[in-house]
Amino acid sequence: QAVTVTENWITTYGHKLNAILANNDEMALGAIKALEAGNRKDVFVLGVDATLDGRNAVREGLMAATVFQDANGQGGGAAKVITTKIKGGNPEKITWVPFQLVDKDSPLLK
């Protein structure tokens, strides 16, 4: 689906299209496939999840970056909220879990 959507964006927006922020690495990789077919190597593409394929795409310079989603951090954040609630407390409405940007200089690519 990301290939088709990106092809449509290339047709509709032409060179005004300068960035694609995808919901996950697989969508970002589909967008990259369409961008390559359209000879558009100038578009900033960001994925999410830091999958092996996503990290490889960053390493190869195909994707600008991906975002590492820390499952342990997310689970720990959820556990803190639940524990606070069980103990009768009022947890914050929003719990921020830090993320890590994985770009060409990231230690996660080493």
Over which residues does each language-model region extend?
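Hinge/cleft segment of the Venus flytrap/periplasmic-binding protein
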Residues: 70-110
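Short, hydrophobic secondary-structure boundary micro-motifs
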Residues: 18-19, 66-67, 93-95
